[in-house]
Design a protein with these regions (language model features):
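Hydrophobic core of transmembrane alpha-helices in multi-pass small-molecule transporters
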Residues: 1-12, 224-238
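Intracellular juxtamembrane helix-capping segments at the cytosolic ends
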Residues: 11-24, 238-252
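A membrane-interface helix-boundary motif in multi-pass transporters
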Residues: 53-83, 280-304
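Multi-pass alpha-helical transporter architecture, strongest
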Residues: 84-95, 298-327
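Juxtamembrane intracellular "pre-TM" segments in multi-pass secondary transporters
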Residues: 99-140
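Short amphipathic helix-loop junctions that connect adjacent transmembrane helices
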Residues: 154-171
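Helix-to-loop junctions at the C-terminal end of transmembrane segments
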Residues: 184-198, 282
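Structural signature of the two symmetry-related core transmembrane helices
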Residues: 200-215
């Protein structure tokens, strides 16, 4: 059941991202994307407050007990999470009206394709990236630099413990502060996207990640680590805010669903190379003690540089394919 629910959640992200170009004109895509990302990080806090009483019997951090609600352990979090997920999704499900089909017979409802048809459609979508300049290069760039970002997220707690000596009591406040920074960073990035363009903003964000990885690797004390963590949290929000508008302007209206599907595939594939590189460095330099974690973190710069390499093949068009300039 957990695997099925996770499949549904990940699949919903494709449609959620593809809706973005339908909600706002190009000049406001960044701002709307930033609002969505910031709301997601705010939801992380709200979710803890709403579901926490079912797990611990009280509101986390506040100790407030809700009459009739008893602590049920971690397993008791799933049902209320599903209910709240549905409730928060209802405004979009009820108010959003997708544009009508541009052609074809609309009298028949949509049919569910078989697995062979799905595989053929994925293959066709990959081939179609050649028709739209920059799409394939962007997806490859996204694969590498998001790989570095995902790896930092996965191993941040281990790095904080092994290198900086953070106890568990400090880890949670640290990640909460980084989450707040991510929400604020997404709002700032949204305005920068609308002012500078998504491609230029993304390049600055990637450069910022290189600087932050260097700062993280060289952090001499916990204060410097806190600074690096807050900056990386802000840049994390920037990554998700800038990537979606860039893909939206690179692909034609009416085809966003297919290409955001490839975008999601690229993001999921980005969970392979980075952890493998990080783990290999840690294993090879085992004799260096905690310093090996610094080396492993610094090696992630190579992935971001690969992202820069492929991003050279991307040029931001004056208008999306099939869209009138200035729309």
């Amino acid at each position: 059941l957990f695997g099925l629910s996770n499949y549904g959640f990940q699949g919903a992200q494709v449609f959620y991202n593809a809706i973005l170009p339908e909600l706002a004109p190009r000049r406001r895509l960044g701002r709307i994307s930033g609002y969505g990302v910031a709301a997601g990080y705010a939801g992380a806090f709200i979710g803890i407050l709403l579901v926490g009483p079912f797990v611990e019997g009280a509101v986390p951090g506040l100790g407030l007990r809700i009459p009739g609600v008893r602590a049920g352990g971690r397993a008791s979090a799933f049902l209320p999470t599903a209910i709240f997920f549905l409730l928060f999704a209802l405004p979009l499900l009820l108010r959003y009206r997708p544009p009508g089909p541009s052609s074809g017979d609309s009298s028949r409802g949509p049919s569910l394709p078989g697995w062979r048809a799905i595989a053929a459609d994925v293959r066709r979508s990959l081939l179609d990236t050649r028709r739209y300049p920059g799409v394939r290069s962007f997806l490859l760039a996204n694969l590498f630099f998001v790989d570095a970002v995902h790896t930092v997220i996965v191993f941040a707690a281990l790095y904080a413990e092994k290198v900086m000596g953070f106890p568990d009591s400090v880890k949670i406040p640290f990640f909460l502060v980084a989450t707040v920074a991510a929400g604020l960073g997404s709002l700032v990035a949204g305005r920068l996207v609308d002012r500078m363009g998504p491609l230029r903003t993304l390049r600055w964000v990637m450069a910022g990640w290189i600087v932050c990885l260097a700062l993280l690797t060289a952090s001499p004390n916990q204060a410097a680590f806190w600074l690096a963590g807050c900056l990386m949290g802000a840049l994390l929000g920037c990554v998700w805010t800038t990537s979606r508008p860039l893909l939206a302007v690179l692909t034609p209206r009416g085809e966003h669903g297919r290409f955001f599907g490839l975008f999601a595939l690229s993001n999921k594939a980005a969970a392979i190379l980075g952890p493998l590189l990080w783990g290999t460095v840690v294993s090879l330099f085992e004799g260096l003690g905690p310093f090996r974690y610094r080396l492993a973190t610094s090696s992630l710069v190579l992935l971001i540089l690969m992202g820069f390499f492929f991003l050279r093949g991307v040029s931001e068009p004056s208008s999306a394919p099939g869209e009138a300039p200035g729309a």
